[in-house]
Every structure is written in structure tokens, then in C-alpha cells.
Amino acid sequence: MDEEKEADSPQPPSKLPRLSGADPNAGVVTMAAPPPPVGLGLGLGLGGDSRGERDVEASAAAAHKATALTFMQQQELEHQVLIYRYFAAGAPVPVHLVLPIWKSVASSSFGPHRFPSLAVMGLGNLCFDYRSSMEPDPGRCRRTDGKKWRCSRDVVPGHKYCERHVHRGRGRSRKPVEASAAATPANNGGGGGIVFSPTSVLLAHGTARAT
């Protein structure tokens, strides 16, 4: 009978853990150990290696320095780098690259009312403008007819025109001015302050003949 009861009673599965009375920690619930942190390499100190963190910090510092410049400062930096490239290549620096720096230094050093002229600094013969820097024939006379024709002669040093066109129009504009200026002192100084007009002379001559 006892054997039949034991056979009829359900047997516990063999895979279930069984508590042993000899175990001193029996029945004690313990927390599982946390898994090691995953290194993301974001420089946040969460499991990343020190070398990766240093690289990220260095790149972040470089990006911060790059963004610390304003737009105008960035443009000026690129301008100076371009000038340095001309120096490194041994080529002459174009005038339109030097002119902004010259204006900036001169205005900050001498003030707006004491701006030194280019002739005083020995640069009077240079044409500091973008049009002259882009001139295809800088040594050619600039006299044109307003269309396609242009004088083919060389310019006079320090001028924009050749010997033929450098004095063009000066004599004609000065002749009537010089003639009137020379006639005025002669009329004022000959009669002791009395000026005789041609009309008065003719009237006096006609009156004398009538008498």
C-alpha cells in the first residue's frame, strides 16, 4: 500500500533548485552584480578609456577655439594666410591684398585727421585701387575714345598717359584766363585809377570834330 501511494504522489522535477540545510546562506536573497559599463567613447567618463577621452577633449577644445572667431576675424585670418602663401612662394603680394592692412594700421596709428598720404610714404606712383591692379596693360597710355580705340604709347613715369596726351587740354583751358588776367592790370595801372572805355573815347572824338 505504501509503495502504491508513493508511486501515485507527484514527484518534483529534478531541475528545480533545492535548498540544503547545511548551506549557511540558505534563504538569503542576494543582488546580482552589475555588468561592467559599456565604453561609448563620448568623453563622458562612462567606461571610455583615458586615451579616447583625451582625444575627444582635444577635438572639442579645437572646435571651441575655431568657433570662438567671429565672421570678420575669420575673413581677416584667411586674408593673412593668403598673403603668407605669397611670401612663402617668393612671389610679389598683390596690391589689393596689402591695401586693407595699410588702411587699418594707418587709421589706428595716425588717427583720421593725420592720415599720411601715399606720396609722403614714397608710394605716390603706385595706384592703390582694384581697377589698376586688374589693368591688363599697366604701362600703356589710358587715353581712349570711349569705345574700342586706345592709345598704344607708353605712359610717362608717374602718370596715366603718354607724352602726347598727358598735357591734353591744359593750354586751351588756360589761354583765356591768362589773357584776361594780363589785361586787367594793364587797364588799372595805366590811367592812375581812371579807366577809359572805347565808347567814351569815340564820343569824345566825335564831339571834338563837331566843334
UniProtKB/Swiss-Prot annotation:
Q: Give the domain note.
A: The QLQ domain and WRC domain may be involved in protein-protein interaction and DNA-binding, respectively.
UniProt family annotation: Belongs to the GRF family.
Q: Any idea which UniProt keywords this protein has?
A: Activator, Nucleus, Transcription, Transcription regulation
Cite the WRC domain residue spans from the record: 135-179
Protein name, UniProt field: Growth-regulating factor 10
The Swiss-Prot or TrEMBL record annotates one GO molecular function as:
ATP binding
Asked whether the keyword Nucleus is assigned, the reply is yes
Q: Where is this region: Disordered?
A: 1-32, 167-190
